[in-house]
């Protein structure tokens, strides 16, 4: 890219899309050298998951035709490795999907990490969310994975990202700014988890600074009911998954960009503004680099190469 004359700017935030009438004229950015405007005949926006809130705001401010996308609200589940060995021995990352009663919303597992570690991530604005990863050499006695409930909104409320952020903020407030952890058995009993109980648990938390508490005090009823019933169903095929000692960390949130209306050449309703859809490719390449999985980075590079070959209009 540098050899082709591309100007790459690091530690620089895009603060605004510049429009005149129904046409995009460029963007405003803010970096180490201060704020400035970059004018262009064509502007490509490719924010990824972390910029979903920013993209939503730009769509509303500039009248960019879009529809609200889904948001995933859930928990990070941690069990002993032996509980998941029937899955881990066959698949590095098993995918389980269910539609539990009474709501029949889609609930799925995601980002399974055998011998992995639960971790904390901080989004812009200080929102603390839970995640998980694994290392090639260093292993724990536990397996962690996400259990996510997909939420869709339409009328009259159509701000799923803001909704999930509020869930995260409330959970952070109960956890004194950090991640909450609770034993599954305590959820079934309708009680919080205490530090002493956590220390005596057979499943030792790999996120040492997680705060023992009550995630049900912050999790919406619909999402919590879906998660509990899904885990009980999974326990039928993976015995021990819904054991009383199983740990649940919250909040695990996955933000997705709005579904911006665009044509086959990625053009939006605003002239000169194009949209790049790299979320899945970026996530897969990032996962390989983050957790040290064998071949992860090569997989990401192959995915990017396939994307380039299949989407020549973007060039």
Tell what function each PLM region has.
Residues 1-314:
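Residues forming the flavin
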């Amino acid at each position: 890219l540098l050899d082709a004359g591309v100007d790459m700017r690091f530690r620089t935030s895009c603060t605004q899309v510049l429009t005149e009438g129904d046409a995009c004229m460029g963007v405003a950015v803010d970096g180490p050298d201060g704020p400035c405007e970059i004018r262009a005949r064509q502007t490509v926006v490719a924010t990824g998951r972390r910029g979903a809130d920013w993209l939503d705001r730009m769509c509303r401010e500039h009248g960019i035709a879009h529809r609200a996308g889904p948001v995933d609200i859930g928990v990070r589940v941690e069990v002993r490795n032996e509980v998941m060995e029937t899955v881990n021995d066959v698949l590095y990352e098993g995918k389980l999907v269910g539609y539990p009663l009474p709501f029949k919303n889609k609930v799925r597992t995601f980002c399974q990490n055998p011998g992995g570690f639960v971790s904390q991530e901080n989004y812009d604005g200080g929102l603390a969310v839970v995640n998980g990863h694994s290392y090639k050499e260093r292993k724990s006695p536990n397996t962690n994975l996400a259990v996510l409930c997909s939420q869709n909104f339409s009328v009259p409320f159509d701000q799923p990202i803001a909704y999930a952020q509020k869930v995260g903020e409330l959970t952070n407030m109960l956890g004194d700014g950090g991640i909450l952890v609770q034993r599954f058995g305590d959820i079934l009993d309708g009680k919080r988890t205490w530090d002493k109980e956590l220390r005596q648990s057979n499943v030792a938390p790999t996120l040492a600074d997680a705060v023992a508490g009550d995630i049900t005090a912050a999790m919406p009823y619909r999402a919590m009911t879906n998660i509990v019933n899904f885990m009980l169903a999974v326990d039928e095929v993976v015995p021990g998954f819904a054991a009383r000692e199983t740990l649940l960390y919250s909040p695990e949130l996955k933000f997705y960009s709005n579904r911006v209306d665009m044509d086959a050449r990625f053009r939006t309703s605003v002239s000169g503004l194009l949209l790049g859809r790299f979320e899945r490719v970026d996530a897969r390449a990032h996962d390989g680099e983050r957790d040290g999985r064998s071949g992860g980075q090569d997989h990401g590079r192959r995915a990017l190469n396939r994307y380039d070959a299949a989407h020549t209009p973007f060039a």
